[in-house]
Amino acid sequence: MCQLFALEAGAEEIRDQFRVNKVMMEISPRKQIEPTDNVPIIVGKQQERRLIESRWGLFPFWAKDSINADLDGVLTKEIFDRIIKKQRCIIPCTSVCKVEDDGKQKQSVSLTYKGSRLFGMAGLYEERVDPRGQVHRTCTIVTTAPGLGVEHHWKGLPVIISEDELEEWLDPGMREKNMWQSRFTPLHADHVSIKVEIEEPVKFTFQMLAGGRA
């Protein structure tokens, strides 16, 4: 699963890389993005491409497929049939992150893509209008099984949209969902860089525990 990611890039870099025509939200670089956070997503075919805001986690937020949607399930489950055909998006990202805890120590693991500092994760989005007419937009990250050398840290990784796949993925006119199965291959160790850092435990002093200054 992908439960944390970073986007350490600004609007101009995102616009240039993904050929965005209209930026419709403010963006500041973030080192940690979590489920239910608002995130930028890219939608629309060429000449109509927009960078818009969405909440990470499809309706309902507590559902199993809320923040991640396995590619096999997306292509076979009826619940995804409508949005995989015409509500695809790209979620820009600079690294995928996680925290591992074996009970003795914690370590943070981050994965970056060797092809580009900034890359696009395949996403699906949904829009609902409340009784007051306000639009609520949510999204999920499409994942697939990790490839050789990566499976030790992840059971599922985001599907990465290459530059060659960008136009077709964002074109709502491309509605043959089964074409995607053969297009996307798992990320192998030679595609990515993985960084592991041991998280230092906080050392409490008497003054800290008593509310004083260490």
Model-derived features: where do they sit?
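Short linear sequence motif anchored by a di-proline
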Residues: 1-214
